[in-house]
Amino acid sequence: MLNLNKLFEIIEIDIQNSKKISELDKIRIKYLGKKGVLTAFMKKLKDFSYEDKKKHSIIINKKKQEIISKINIKKQKLSVYILEQRIKSETIDISLPGRRTEHGGFHPITNTIDYIKNFFLKLGFQSINSPEIEDEYHNFDALNISKYHPARDSHDTFWFDRNRLLRTQTSSMQIRIMKQEKPPIRFIFPGKVYRNDYDITHTPMFHQIEGLIVDKNINFSNLKWIIYKFLYDFFGKEVLIKFRPSYFPFTVPSAEVDIIDHNGKSLEILGCGMVHPNVLKNVNIDSKIYSACAFGLGIERIAMLRYGITDIRSFFENDIRFLKQFKYN
């Protein structure tokens, strides 16, 4: 009996020292389970006399009920404690300011394209998407760039086969639209173009916007007026603009347009010119009746100038720190 009393004391101490509900379950199994200590003690009572067996059975069963009761009480206390700790850890201070909701923003290239499109739509232009995979005829031949023309070398073309390629310029859409539409024509063609070049000012994929006007009595003065109007709107009226003669196979005369920075340095912005009579002939437009002008500009280049970006690759690296700067522009 002394050993039994000592055992009950040990069980009570174990229950009191328990810090987890799982520990209480282990105590219950250890002492009260089928293979538990008290169960084993009960089996030994068969060797006792009838009176001793009866006496000890009553004591043990009473203690078992007390142990079960104490385990349940301890479980309730631990459950309350765990809940209190959880509530404490998840408490929200309602006096603190709420978390600011982040809003998405457009990529600076998308912003620039949308700005340019909106400007030309106000002037009566229509905007149309165009295929990025082209054939040799629309990308080169119809634009007065014949098979062995040296201008092809500067395009660094990605070829799929002998006829299909990733377009090197949005000018290819000029041919398609002039074959589909009858003059007067006034369209812009924004889109991606591809050239095999990669450095701080070039990427294998970049964006262009091509503009085309076909009508009677269109001249270079009309073209200059449109370009001045656009550049003043985009960069501000204080910008200095310079036209200089250039050469493109599909326009004649041709010019490149520069803006002059605060250091007096010329920065090329776009190319333009009157559409070559051979190009009009290729789309069955009579150059004696109609004339046409065209211009093309690189979106990344003017975005770099507008936002003061020095490396074109920054547009395509998806650095959130970089992109966040343009969220509200």
From Swiss-Prot:
Q: What is its main location?
A: cytoplasm
What does the Swiss-Prot or TrEMBL cofactor note state?
Binds 2 magnesium ions per tetramer.
Q: Name one GO cellular component term.
A: cytoplasm
Tree of life domain: Bacteria
Q: Does the keyword Electron transport apply?
A: no
A Pfam match is tRNA-synt_2d
Q: Which cofactor does it need?
A: Mg(2+)
The places in or outside the cell where this protein is found are: Cytoplasm
Q: What range does the record give for the signal peptide?
A: none
Q: What are the protein's GO molecular function terms?
A: ATP binding; magnesium ion binding; phenylalanine-tRNA ligase activity; tRNA binding
Q: Which residues form a coiled coil?
A: none
Q: Which reaction does it catalyse?
A: tRNA(Phe) + L-phenylalanine + ATP = L-phenylalanyl-tRNA(Phe) + AMP + diphosphate + H(+)
Q: Does the keyword Nucleotide-binding apply?
A: yes
GO BP of this protein? phenylalanyl-tRNA aminoacylation
Q: What is its EC number?
A: 6.1.1.20
| Assembly mode | Tetramer of two alpha and two beta subunits.
Official protein name in the record: Phenylalanine--tRNA ligase alpha subunit
